[in-house]
Amino acid sequence: MSSVSASSGVPEHTSLKQIEVLVVQSNPADTFLTLAALESAGLTGGLRCVSEGQEALSYILRKEPFANAPVPNLIFLDLSEPRVSGLEVLRVIKSTPALMHIPIVVAAGSEDPDFVRSVYALNGNCFIRKPGELAEFVRFIETCYHFWGSVVTLATVEKVHRKPKKGMEVPGPNS
């Protein structure tokens, strides 16, 4: 059973799953807001942040210094990443069999139709335009987290690591 939060209008679910969340965001202010929104939403599980696309790829592909980092169940990805674009991060994750199951919520400052098409063509799970209003931004992040954290069934890290089929292994530090 769920109720609705009076402050945000987002459903309050009593059955939020423990999930690992990775936030890829180059703007420190947006990182802070995203983390605050996830905490407000009742994040259970781990939360990791990286500040740019190359670092995100090292993290998700478990390269040093992230060789022992947990595989996330959900990724919030900013499109405007320096050096390695958010679209490239999305492409790499969604083309790696052991990682393609991870839902990726892509955020951008505009709704450019070409960007939106590119995100979905690369199998992004959700595209949201970052709203200008703080309360709206927090509501979007909370809503996404509640959806992925309580409504849907996610592939778990344990299932991925247990006995993956040939070619489905999560890359290790020497990959």
Name these PLM-found stretches:
Residues M1-R48, Q54-E55, L61, P65-V71, ...:
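Non-catalytic signal-transmission and effector/linker regions of two-component phosphorelay proteins
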Residues N27-D30, P82, A98, S110-D114:
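Negatively charged, flexible loop motifs adjacent to catalytic sites
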Residues L35-A36, E88, S110-I128, G132, ...:
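Alpha4 helix (beta4-alpha4-beta5 surface) of REC/receiver domains from two-component response regulators
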Residues C49, E81-V84:
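Residue-level signal for the "D+5" position in two-component response regulator receiver
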Residues E52, S85-E88:
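Acidic catalytic/metal-coordinating carboxylates
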Residues L74:
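Short, Asp-centered acidic motifs that coordinate Mg2+ and/or phosphate
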Residues L77-L79, A108:
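Active-site residues of response regulator receiver
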Residues L87-M100:
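Short amphipathic alpha-helix used as the core "switch/output" element in two-component signaling
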